[in-house]
Amino acid sequence: MPIRIRLDELLKEREMTLTELSHRVEITVVNLSILKNGHAKAIRFSTLVRLCAALECQPGDLLTYVPET
């Protein structure tokens, strides 16, 4: 998929676990794992807003476009 989720990198930079993020954004660890591993087909804006608030970042910090070659 040409959209890459940088959740792992942001969690490491903030020394935060997936479980801690799950509690902060009220999304299950399973669903966050699906997103983190690039298996999600879509993300709701409300989810993106909660992730950005919890990680203190902008959407562009979390999502990157990688052209397919």
Model regions: which residues?
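Short alpha-helical DNA-recognition segment
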Residues: 16-34
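A short, Lys/Arg-rich alpha-helix, primarily the initiator
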Residues: 1-16
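Short, basic-rich loop-to-helix N-cap that marks the start of a DNA-contacting helix
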Residues: 39-50
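Residues within the helices of the helix-turn-helix
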Residues: 8, 19, 49
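Residue-level recognition of specific faces of alpha-helices
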Residues: 31-34, 47, 61
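The alpha-helix within a helix-turn-helix
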Residues: 11, 22, 52
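Short, charged recognition helix plus adjacent turn
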Residues: 34, 41, 63-69
